[in-house]
């Protein structure tokens, strides 16, 4: 019976399934992919890691008590950002859930990747066109040309027809 193949979720987002497991995490071509699906997976992994850390800090230290009796060592905090928990007073009903959430608020700082929209991803992919296509695009040669192209593209205002009339009237009044 063949070994079960590893399914990388980042590759699966892009239609590639059954990647070989050994060394794939370091070699995954979508490891730093900015698309929204990959960003969601990365955020989910980060949140899972935070959840594991919370469970680990909330578990009683049963394994360490036996070793700490044999060799006394000074206690050191697990992390400088872990605040002390307030004592939990049991209540009934919906308040129990709210109190458990509010009493377990801990300060964890985790940098999550930015999620980009599909439109932004398409624009990024257009920018990754081959060099020949990018050379065909006209680039402004001066600041004035760049400003002119911006003004031309700016006609997406909802008042563009009124603005065009105002520009037309001012041009005819100058003549």
UniProtKB/Swiss-Prot annotation:
Entry keyword annotation includes Zinc: yes
Tissue: Expressed in a limited number of non-sex-specific tissues in males, including 6-8 unidentified neurons of the head, ventral body wall muscle, and the PHCL/R neurons.
Comp. bias regions, Polar residues: 59-71
Region described as Disordered: 58-93
Function: Probable transcription factor that plays a role in the development of the dopaminergic neurons of the male-specific genital sensilla (simple sense organs) known as rays, by negatively regulating the activity of the transcription factor ast-1. Involved in male mating behavior, probably as a result of a role in the differentiation of male-specific diagonal muscles. Required for development of the male proctodeum. May be dispensable in hermaphrodites.
Location of this chain's protein in the cell: Nucleus
One GO BP: regulation of nematode male tail tip morphogenesis
Protein name as annotated: DM domain-containing protein mab-23
InterPro entries membership: DM_DNA-bd, DM_DNA-bd_sf
Low complexity bias (residue ranges): 81-91
GO cellular component term of the entry, any: nucleus
GO molecular function: metal ion binding; sequence-specific DNA binding
DNA-binding region residue numbers: 8-56
Annotated knockout phenotype: RNAi-mediated knockdown causes defects in patterning of the dopaminergic neurons of the male-specific genital sensilla (simple sense organs) known as rays. Males are unable to sire progeny due to abnormal tail and gonad morphology, whereas hermaphrodites have no obvious phenotypic defects.
SUPFAM superfamilies: Cysteine-rich DNA binding domain, (DM domain) (SSF82927)
UniProt keyword terms in alphabetical order: DNA-binding, Metal-binding, Nucleus, Zinc
This protein's record includes keyword Zinc: yes
Pfam families for this protein: DM (PF00751)
Protein origin, superkingdom: Eukaryota
